[in-house]
Amino acid sequence: MEDRHNLNFATYEEGKLTLEEYLTRVVFYQKRSFTQAEFRRFMFAQSKPYPDMIELVAQLKVRHGLKIAVVSNEARELNAYRIRNFKLARFVDSFVSSCFAHVRKPDADIFRLALDIAQASAPQVVYIENTPMFVQIAEGLGIRSILHTDYTSTCAKLASFGLRNDEGVVHETS
């Protein structure tokens, strides 16, 4: 199954396969003890929000008048699920997702596309990412970047760029 996943995952994340097509190729090419619907429910249930980070970015948008663009490698169905269930559209201006762009990180074109959509130059942007290689690629394009490892260090780095939360300070979370 891992080989099948590796062969199909990029195509799936680039929006060239539906979830049903992907699951049929990778999981349900043979009889299973669970249904595709059960597997989908399980898969979506694994997706958890990061409420502190969501609230931080929403606050920074209001406080500093920021334009928020999300650049992600994500398949269409999971992307829609997260946007809806985590209420991301309430503060995100554009979603540059691999499933829409048909290109995925680490391809630098997805970052260039995000800059074009946002109508922003690289030095105007702060990119937050938890994958070191993607941070390096963005930095190579002149985008100020933060390697997210935890809320507190990300807040500190944002503050160093002049972006503080509503209280004007970096604060600890419980």
Where are these regions (language model features)?
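Asp-based, Mg2+/Mn2+-dependent phosphohydrolase catalytic module
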Residues: A75-R76, A80-S174
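Short coil/turn segments at beta-strand junctions that form active-site/ligand-binding loops
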Residues: H64-K67, P123-Q124
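Proline-centered loop/turn at the N-terminus of a beta-strand
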Residues: K67-A69, R144
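N-terminal-biased segments
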Residues: N8-F9, I68, V96
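N-terminal helical cap/lid subdomain that shapes the substrate entry/recognition surface
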Residues: M1-E55, V62-H64, A75-E77
